[in-house]
Amino acid sequence: MDPDRQADIAALAATLTTVERVLDVDGLRDRIQKLEQEASDPNLWDDQSRAQKVTSELSHAQNELRRVEELRQRVEDLPVLYEMAAEEEGQDAENAGAEADAELAKLRVDIEAMEVRTLLSGEYDEREAVVTIRSGAGGVDAADWAEMLMRMYIRWAEQHDYPVEVFDTSYAEEAGIKSATFAVHAPYAYGTLSVEQGTHRLVRISPFDNQSRRQTSFADVEVLPVVETTDHIDVPETDLRVDVYRSSGPGGQSVNTTDSAVRLTHIPTGIVVTCQNEKSQLQNKVAAMRVLQAKLLARKKQEERAELDALKGDGGSSWGNQMRSYVLHPYQMVKDLRTEYEVGNPSAVLDGDIDGFLEAGIRWRNRRDDD
């Protein structure tokens, strides 16, 4: 085998060994065994919230172990592919060598993607995520853009078999949404999606403009970790104002004949959370409370970071303003303004193919935090 190819394979094997060590593959197997025992308990579904958490964590752990084991097998198979190519002659040898090179390149990409998972070591990175999208400047185009972003993230979650729970959708009058809040129920969803926080900019020919003029629209994305009991985010009833109303759909159309939608106002901070997608008022209140607790946790951590930055004489780093540009006209390009990562296929990106942006963002964040 070519010495350069041997060196490439050895480097990939070493990287994968590091990934296996960081992920604690043996511990992962033990965790799967315990979760399987818990999932087999016939009484588990008496607590649906707990059952969903167990099954989601089990599925994620099984998929993670399967990915690592498949990568290890592919690393071990790669030298065999090159040996088989060396035994061929003429065009067959050339074709077999090209196939081995293609597998080497693909394996490098897949191992690097798995390596990114080991970078998710922040305090809340392993949590599930609550995502809120709000339309910004740009009128009806911005509302349509906010809905396109919501679809993009939901499609991404679906492609990874991550359950999504929509808490609230506030529809705009003509098209699109004013805002939406949903949860992605998967381990490490917060650590992965938190790099999406910021302002997303769309440039396109407006489908709502009779003169087909180019329009720039903005939408803001907020990503929060789901709060757990260990976070001790207690909200006394005396700090809440609870309003109920009828759920509404696109164009303000009522979709419920009872006052099941809930709006929570946290009086001390002025934070407002609404939820209307559950069937009952109680379910909507519980869901709204989960989102409110996530926002209060984020506010608490933001205040702590601000105090630390003040002590350090550091203005702090903000994700605010533009972080990614999606250009559909006059050319086609999606570019992250922090990482410089770009893709010339906006249709695929808007259909949920954002793993490249997520991986680049996670690496960028870790480099920034190390500086």
From Swiss-Prot:
The keyword Secreted does not apply. GO terms for cellular component: cytoplasm. PROSITE patterns: RF_PROK_I. It comes from the Bacteria. Its main location: cytoplasm. Transmembrane segments: none annotated. Coiled coil: none annotated. Belongs to the prokaryotic/mitochondrial release factor family. Peptide chain release factor 2 directs the termination of translation in response to the peptide chain termination codons UGA and UAA. HAMAP family: Rel_fac_2. PANTHER family: CLASS I PEPTIDE CHAIN RELEASE FACTOR, PEPTIDE CHAIN RELEASE FACTOR 2. This is Peptide chain release factor 2. It comes from Mycobacterium sp. (strain KMS). The gene is prfB.
